[in-house]
Curated annotation (Swiss-Prot):
It comes from the Archaea. GO terms for molecular function: rRNA binding; structural constituent of ribosome; tRNA binding. Belongs to the universal ribosomal protein uL1 family. Part of the 50S ribosomal subunit. It holds the Pfam family Ribosomal_L1. PROSITE patterns: RIBOSOMAL_L1. This is Large ribosomal subunit protein uL1. It comes from Methanococcus maripaludis (strain DSM 14266 / JCM 13030 / NBRC 101832 / S2 / LL).
Amino acid sequence: MDSEKILNAVKEARTLAKPRNFTQSVDLIVNLKELDLSRPENRLKEQIVLPSGRGKDVAIAVIAKGDLAAQAEDMGLTVIRQEELEELGKNKKTAKKIANAHGFFIAQADMMPLVGKSLGPVLGPRGKMPQPVPANANLAPLVARFQKTVAINTRDKALFQVYIGTESMSDDELAANAEAILNVVSKKYEKGLYHVKNAFTKLTMGAAAPIEK
C-alpha cells in the first residue's frame, strides 16, 4: 500500500475521533482474504518492532528467582516468583488478570516447565507465552525491544487489530508504524498484499478510516 495513502488514513482517523480527556490509542485493522487459516502456515504470528516506537510504555512481567528477579525489580518490572507462579496455577481468575494487564512476559529458562503448567493455559491462547532467558541474562536490551514491539496472532481469524501508537504521536510516526506492519503481511504471503481485503486506522473512540488501495 502506498505510504501517502496510509498517511492520509491516519489523518482522517484523527478527524473522525472527538477529543477525549485521555490519550487515545491508534490501531491498524486488517481484513484478510483468500487464505485457508485452518492451515498454520497461513496464520500470522509475528512480533514486529515499530520504527516509531509505541508512544507509551507497555507492561512487562518477569517470571524469575534470585538475581534475575532482583534485576527485574530494580527495573520497575512486575516480578512473579516461583511461589506466586504456583499460586497462579490454582487461581485462573487472577492469572487472567495478570495476563491481560501485561503485554509481554519474560521467564527464567529453568522455570519454563512450571510456567507451562501454571500459566500456559492462560498465556498460550493470548499469544503471550514468555520469552525464555538464562538466569544470568541482561534484561535491558530485551525490555527495550519489547517497549517498541507489538504482537500479532491471527489464529484462524481473517482479521486482526493491532496497536500502532497514541494520538500524541505525529501522523508520520503512526503511518510509519502502520506501514511496517503491512510490510510484514506482504512478505508473509507469496501474493503479498493481494491477501489484504481492506485495512483501516482508528482511534479508540473514533470511527475507522479506510486505507485506499
